[in-house]
Amino acid sequence: MNTEKIKNKLKPIIYPIINFIPRRRLKNKNFTIICDNCWAGKVYQELGLPYQTPFVGMFVFSPDYIKMLKNLKHYLSGNIPLKFVQESKYIKDFDNAYPLAILDDIELHFLHYADEEEATQKWNRRLKRMHWDNLYFKFNDNDACTYELMKEFEELPYKSKVIFSSK
């Protein structure tokens, strides 16, 4: 058996043991992570919590992400339908390997979704789970990020935010 197969078989046994203490100590279980990629989903998985954000299995290019954060209630109100498209303003020769949607004027890349129906259902369901009174924001320096965009993120009026950067 190769190493990867062994790791995959041990994960369901080892992870609950490793995560037991952090999960037990966690008091704040009703929070929403707004992020620019799949990171939020991994956090909820590690903590053994249901997804409380629509930002799972997807990513948003940095310019659109910052634009969205500047008017968050508008974009995440649930009143704007997803419009699926075939072309990206960021990816030349987009191959449509995953669903790509426009939310008003923001591109949402549903990277880990099989089709438009799945993306729409999960997006709408998770929008309803958001905890507007307990938001955390995460940004990183991928996907067309610039130093100026990182500065804009830092200047946003949200208190609980973090940037992961290698720049």
Residue map of PLM features:
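Membrane-proximal basic amphipathic "stem/tether" segments
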Residues: 1-29
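A generic structural motif
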Residues: 160-167
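Short, surface-exposed basic-aromatic patches at helix termini and helix-loop junctions that form
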Residues: 151-158
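Positively charged, amphipathic N-terminal segments that serve as targeting/anchoring signals
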Residues: 20-141, 145-146, 159-160
